[in-house]
Amino acid sequence: IVNEQSLMQPDTDFVKIRLEAQRFLEDSCKNNNIGFSVCYFGDVYGNASWFTEMIVNRLKNGTFKIPGKGDYDKCFIHVDDAVGILLSIAKNNLKDQSYVCADSTSVTFKEFVDYTADKIGKKHPGGIPMFLAKGVLGSDLVKLLTTPMKISNQKVSEIYKFVYPSYKEGINSILES
């Protein structure tokens, strides 16, 4: 379970570049006596986002496929909660902190997608072999999407009360809007 004390082990180019940018910003802030805090967000979803475009719309037209079996744990956070956390950090002037930010529910990618399909009355999608997914999306993106991750949001929960404590409430709010 990943928390704020976990060792960083970037295994994709995307994460490596993101951590380099973080180090640059952190160093620049320290050199200029500016407080710095960082949020490590799970997969942020919301209306008119990758969730709507890549999952909902493709489930509706029957073209969505899950990379592999979808049995990898993922961490999700609704965009409203992501913004709420950032506002809480700013309003409370919390400096030199790190926060792991995702909702409180552990879920596999397949469970997340199947729940969405059920809510819109569509069939559960099948999987696509990993080698095909890598051919279409690239191996770095597939690795990023399919790396299992479980987190503890205990620290961030001390400064913020989630509007959507699980992906189910978050998905419902999007689909009902």
Q: Could you say what each language-model-derived stretch is?
A:
Residues 9-37:
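Active-site Tyr-X1-5-Lys
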Residues 46, 74-80, 107, 151, ...:
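Residue-level signal for the nucleotide or nucleotide-sugar donor/cofactor binding architecture
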Residues 123, 142-177:
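C-terminal amphipathic/interface module of NAD(P)-dependent oxidoreductases
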